[in-house]
């Protein structure tokens, strides 16, 4: 837009995509602490009945079965965010970027690829956008409950929005330029919150529109926020609600 040359550019979230820890272990329901999760993906925990997993799942009969880690073989924003999460949440993860290290487990291409692999391999585990895990539920794929510090949390609309309640943003020139502080998000441990999420952004000029264009831009973003429908949910995205939705609407109102 020509107006952006004379105005600040705002980033704001439109959809929130939670990342599931998806696994294939028959009917066994699994809880994993962030520390245990990091050790699994580093290859330090190799069996499902490892004492660390047993400590996270008291009273559960865990199988003496090999863990097969499945990772994204292609470059991916999900891999970049998951590695940021492991570093922030555990303090013990050295790799970063869109390429996941290929030192442990097996690679698969794309979100559907890793979900397929987990469905096909008994004992497999991966990180994947929630919707792809849901699509494989009928093939034995389950989502682990993650203990971020206050007990195991199930991935749900409620737990993701709980994480969004205390979302921190990076220091910018405007409160309406909403760039998420992912390090603060991933290391947060609010009770009942699921902070392992991907945020996607729209980029928009903050001002400089003529009256008609301003109305169109505001109308577009208002419609996006007001119609977070079942179709989004089917693709694994979570509708934004509550206080965070109010902040996003205020940012739309501030456009000039």
Residue ranges of predicted features:
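A conserved helix-loop-strand patch within extracytoplasmic ligand-binding domains
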Residues: 8, 15-70, 74
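Structural recognition of the beta-strand scaffold that forms the well-ordered cores
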Residues: 12, 20-23, 68-71, 81, ...
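Single conserved hydrophobic/aromatic residue that forms the stacking wall/gate
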Residues: 1-6, 10
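Sec-exported extracytoplasmic/periplasmic mature domains
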Residues: 23-26, 39-50, 74-75, 83-91, ...
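Small-molecule pocket liners
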Residues: 16-21, 27, 66-67, 151-152, ...
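Ligand-binding pocket segment of bilobal, Venus flytrap-like solute-binding proteins
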Residues: 75-170
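Second-shell loop/turn segments in exported
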Residues: 8, 23-28, 66-72, 101-105, ...
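Extracellular/periplasmic juxtamembrane helices and adjacent flexible linkers that interface
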Residues: 58-65, 176-179, 183-256
């Amino acid at each position: 837009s020509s107006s952006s040359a004379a105005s600040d550019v705002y980033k704001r979230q439109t959809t929130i995509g939670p990342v599931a820890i998806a696994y294939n272990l028959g009917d066994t329901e699994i809880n994993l602490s962030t520390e245990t999760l990091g050790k699994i993906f580093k290859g330090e925990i190799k069996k499902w009945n490892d004492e660390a997993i047993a400590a996270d799942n008291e009273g559960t009969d865990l199988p003496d079965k090999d863990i097969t880690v499945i990772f994204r073989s292609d470059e991916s924003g999900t891999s970049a965010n998951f590695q940021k999460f492991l570093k922030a949440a555990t303090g013990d993860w050295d790799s970063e970027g869109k390429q996941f290290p290929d030192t442990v487990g097996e690679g698969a291409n794309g979100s559907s690829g890793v979900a397929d692999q987990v469905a096909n391999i008994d004992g497999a585990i991966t990180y994947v956008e929630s919707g792809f895990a849901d699509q494989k539920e009928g093939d034995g794929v389950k989502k682990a409950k993650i203990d971020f510090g206050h007990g195991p949390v199930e991935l749900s609309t409620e737990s993701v929005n709980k994480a969004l309640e205390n979302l921190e943003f990076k220091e910018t020139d405007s409160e309406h330029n909403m760039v998420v502080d992912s390090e603060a998000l991933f290391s947060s441990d609010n009770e009942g919150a699921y902070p392992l999420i991907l945020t996607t952004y729209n980029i928009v000029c903050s001002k400089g529109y003529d009256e008609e264009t301003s109305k169109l831009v505001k109308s577009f973003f208002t419609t996006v926020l007001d119609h977070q429908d079942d179709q989004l949910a089917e693709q694994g995205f979570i509708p934004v609600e509550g206080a965070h939705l109010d902040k996003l609407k205020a940012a739309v109102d501030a456009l000039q």
